[in-house]
């Protein structure tokens, strides 16, 4: 009987541990950006997509709900000098519900993209709703234009002292882990100065939006 009791206790403990591990695996990660430092889509909190005919508003929407994007620069590495070089970077244009449209970054000189930007500040940033639950929920492939993505081109520069607090608040509220990154990496705040915008949200090719149209959108 004692052996049976010990066996039952072990079985119960194993079941409890298994259920706890499963809960950890399926629960949304915290501190990855988005509302409440979780996912924008948790509990259906992703705001509705603006009308597709309003390309400027769609562009602002994608920028605001994006926690990361792919930044393409021109490589300075000898092996691939002069070739396109893309890297994934975390970003934020402001606290949830209060986006400015300006993509801010937290960068280090140790990053290859930063070395490229020091020689040539021109870059193109791509952001897509594939990083949210929008495309999966509607059955859209990430390459489909219905799975909205945008391309912003311009120059990446360090933010000045007057903009430092805005960039810091915008990034740290969506990416709190950044606060713990090693200071020895000499992190600094930067932004994309947008000169050209393309919106791909439907079949027929990209729509062109001017920076003026983009920044004139009132985010609600």
From Swiss-Prot:
Record bears the keyword Signal: yes
Residues in coiled coil: none
Signal sequence extent: 1-31
Post-translational modifications: N-glycosylated.
GO CC field: azurophil granule lumen; endosome; extracellular exosome; extracellular region; extracellular space; transcription regulator complex
GO aspect biological process, one term: endocytosis
Gene Ontology MF terms in the entry: transcription corepressor activity
Function noted in UniProt: May contribute to the transcriptional control of cell growth and differentiation. Antagonizes transcriptional activation and cellular transformation by the adenovirus E1A protein. The transcriptional control activity of cell growth requires interaction with IGF2R.
Family of the protein in this entry: Belongs to the CREG family.
Name of the molecule in the record: Protein CREG1
Organism: Homo sapiens (Human)
């Amino acid at each position: 009987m004692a052996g049976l009791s010990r066996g039952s206790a072990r079985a119960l403990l194993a079941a409890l541990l298994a259920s706890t591990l499963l809960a950890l695996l399926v629960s949304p990660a915290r501190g990855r950006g988005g509302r409440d430092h979780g996912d924008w889509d948790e509990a259906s909190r992703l705001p509705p997509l603006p009308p597709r005919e309003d390309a400027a508003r769609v562009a602002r929407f994608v920028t605001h709900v994006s926690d990361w994007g792919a930044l393409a620069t021109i490589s300075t590495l000898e092996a691939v000098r002069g070739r396109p070089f893309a890297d994934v970077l975390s970003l934020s244009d402001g606290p949830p519900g209060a986006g400015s449209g300006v993509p801010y970054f937290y960068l280090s000189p140790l990053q290859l993209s930063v070395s490229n930007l020091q020689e040539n500040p021109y870059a193109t940033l791509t952001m897509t709703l594939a990083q949210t639950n929008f495309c999966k929920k509607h059955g859209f492939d990430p390459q489909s234009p219905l799975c909205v993505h945008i391309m912003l081109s311009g120059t990446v520069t360090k933010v000045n002292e007057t903009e430092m607090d805005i960039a810091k608040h915008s990034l740290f509220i969506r990416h709190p882990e950044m606060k713990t990154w090693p200071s020895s990496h000499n992190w600094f705040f930067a932004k994309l100065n947008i000169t050209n915008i393309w919106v791909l949200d439907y079949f027929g090719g990209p729509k062109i939006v001017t920076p003026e149209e983009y920044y004139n959108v009132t985010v609600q």
